[in-house]
Amino acid sequence: MSAPLIDKYRKMATFDWKKLKAAVEGEEHVRLKSEVVAKMKSEPVFHRDYRVLSREEQREVVHQRWKKIVEWGLFKDPYSDLENFHALTETLEAYDQGTSARLFLHGNVFGAAVKSMGTDRHKDLIQKTENNEIVGAFCLTEVGHGSNTAEIQTTATFDNGELVFNTPSVSAIKCWAGNLAHSATHVVVYAQLHVEGKNEGFHGFVIQVRCPRTFQTLPGITIGDMGSKPGCWQGVENGWMEFKNHRAPLSALLNKGCDITPDGKYVTSFKSASEKQSVSLGTLSVGRLGIIAKGMMACTFASTIAIRYSVARRQFGPVKGAENEIPVLEYPLQQYRLFPYLSAAICIRIFQKKFVGHFTEYMMRVIMGEKSDELSEFSKEVHALSSGAKPVATWLGVESLGEARKACGGHGYLQMSRLNTLRDDNDPSQTFEGENFMILQQTSNILLGKAQSIGSIETPMSTMSFLNQKPSKFSSWSSNPVNDVLSAYRYLTYHLLQTTSAEAYRLKASGKNSFEVRNEIQIHRAVNLSVAYTEHTMIHWVQQFLKEIEDQSVKPVLQKVLNLFSLFLLERHLATLYITGYASGGKFGEDLREKLRLAVAELKPEAIALVDSIAPDDFILHSALGASDGKAYEHIMEEFRKYTNEQPRWVCDLAQFLQKRSQGSKL
């Protein structure tokens, strides 16, 4: 019954889902992902069921899968072989974030840090990283410091031609470093550099921490595991590390733009501490850029599983009788709960793909050794946008999985739905690489720094240029809802920038110091400013993509998707739009919500085909509720029957207990 029904919904679509997939992802990307999936299907180590593995089992299987991926030799450098790398990491992210993390932390985080902050003296190490002759980890976070990177406490002191690393307190112990607990042979570690009694500030270093033959830690280094975590993160070796007079060669300093001379003098070509920090910030952005994709993938899973299941699930109908029950996807409320996340999955993908292109250009310029004011500005803009997009994407992703689980009713709570595991897997995306509310402050700090330059703001990615013109208040709706939404966002962002800046000035004039001012402007002002700027950029970039799209046959449905995504996001700012004076009276809000309801309804005939265009292969999806054949009940029962007549040992005790109770009641 279910399969023909899902086919019926597929036939409602006005477009070819394969063409849409190719248009959004690129034909080569789709082909490469299919090759990766085929390789995974052919290897028993990638086959799985719905059992919950122990921590040791998870780490063992992640290790074996990682070995197999390395043996495939699909890529060496994520920047010179970008398409292969993204095809592999996206497929692995969908399959298991634990396996993906093992690969990503080594190549894309550790490797990128050494490349971007190192020099020729680190070439041998870079080569070993690319050849997977070593395993890398990235050690920034400490027990007592995460987001406040400038105040980390680990020290690296220059002494007789070497660097001596120390952990001065419990709060300075490095932690949350993936790959560190058991596997890492080398790490990028951040510490305060002390030369001739002076603290030269926050610097990056690369050091060996284990012997690659015995895997024993080197003298002066203690490494341990951080214990159990929910979901796939059990498979990630998050470790802690403590230094006690560990000596490393001077070459450990990642010396692009700074160095220590043989006679012990600190030298730097950076013009300021902020310029030096911007290079590090650009490096840190790579992690946040990857986490944006996690938000996209979460929305993809949520909408795929819940929408497909909503076709198979029939409940109630206009007249009594089981034969008259209708799919729950027909209910407008079910559509309203799920379709916005379907639109988010597609739009965030388009946005993230463009952002990756910009970031790759930025990183290549850094690696080539360029130093310019324009590149420094590029770094700040990358940092501002990644610090805004990571929270927006991950909040949507985690939210979508929670809504999907509830929209699937009781069956959604089964392990075989995969929705619960996915919620556990994606929940930490809101805190790692920067707690969301904290890093939004980094976005607003950069935007507020532009407040005095309105009229002449120029940035490499042009994400802030709209602030140069004072926007108008709402007058009327046009025939293009996306243009209307962007106009509202421009007003909202401009107004929030002006009012937040004015409030900061007022607080400073009242005697508050900069720290107090920065904290007091966050609620309802700076946080909203960062979110508005980010969402405007997301919508604008997707609109640009649609203007340039080659396959015109899929443009109309993508326009419907963008209409829904933009209206869905803007509706969340409705109260602020009224408070700021963008509109008055109830009609603007009523019209906005009516347009949102219509945008949801317009997507119903397209929904299953849109899901097909974004859904991973069933082997990767691994959900009984969300399989592409629409046979949810059959897949559920297939799993149920695996547990037929399995009697646990305690049933004998139960029988004896009931017998005693029965005998007692007769007395």
From Swiss-Prot:
* Pathway membership: Lipid metabolism; peroxisomal fatty acid beta-oxidation
| Keywords of the record | FAD, Fatty acid metabolism, Flavoprotein, Lipid metabolism, Oxidoreductase, Peroxisome
Question: Which molecular-function annotations from GO does this UniProt entry contain?
Answer: FAD binding; fatty acid binding; flavin adenine dinucleotide binding; pristanoyl-CoA oxidase activity
Extent of motif Microbody targeting signal:
665-667
Q: CDD domains from the entry?
A: AXO
Pfam families, from UniProt? ACOX, ACOX_C_alpha1
Annotated GO biological processes are: ascaroside biosynthetic process; fatty acid beta-oxidation using acyl-CoA oxidase
Tissue/organ expression: Expressed in intestine.
What Enzyme Commission number(s) does the record list for this chain?
1.3.3.-
Q: Which SUPFAM superfamilies match?
A: Acyl-CoA dehydrogenase C-terminal domain-like (SSF47203), Acyl-CoA dehydrogenase NM domain-like (SSF56645)
Q: State the activity regulation.
A: In contrast to other acyl-coenzyme A oxidases which bind to and are activated by ATP, does not bind ATP.
Reaction(s) catalysed by this chain, per the record, are: IC-asc-C7-CoA + O2 = IC-asc-DeltaC7-CoA + H2O2; IC-asc-C9-CoA + O2 = IC-asc-DeltaC9-CoA + H2O2; asc-C13-CoA + O2 = asc-DeltaC13-CoA + H2O2
* Positions bound to FAD: F138, C139, L140, T141, G146, S147, G178, R313, Q334, Q335, Y336, R337, G410, E435
An annotated GO cellular component of this protein is: peroxisome
Q: Where is the active site?
A: E433 (proton acceptor)
Q: Where in the cell is it found?
A: Peroxisome
Which cofactors go with this protein?
FAD
Q: What class of enzyme is it?
A: oxidoreductase
Where mainly located? other
* Taxonomic superkingdom: Eukaryota
Task: Please give the Gene3D superfamilies that the UniProt record associates with this protein.
Answer: Butyryl-CoA Dehydrogenase, subunit A, domain 2 (2.40.110.10), Butyryl-CoA Dehydrogenase, subunit A, domain 3 (1.20.140.10)
Q: Which family does it belong to?
A: Belongs to the acyl-CoA oxidase family.
PANTHER family attached here?
ELECTRON TRANSPORT OXIDOREDUCTASE, PEROXISOMAL ACYL-COENZYME A OXIDASE 3
What is its biological role? Answer: Involved in the first step of peroxisomal beta-oxidation by catalyzing the desaturation of fatty acid-derived side chains of ascaroside pheromones, which regulates development and behavior. Specifically, shortens indol-3-carbonyl(IC)-ascarosides with 7-carbon (IC-asc-C7) or 9-carbon (IC-asc-C9) side chains and contributes to the shortening of ascarosides with 13-carbon (asc-C13) and 15-carbon (asc-C15) side chains.
What interactions and quaternary structure are annotated?
Homodimer.
Q: What is this protein called?
A: Acyl-coenzyme A oxidase acox-3
Give the organism, scientific name: Caenorhabditis elegans
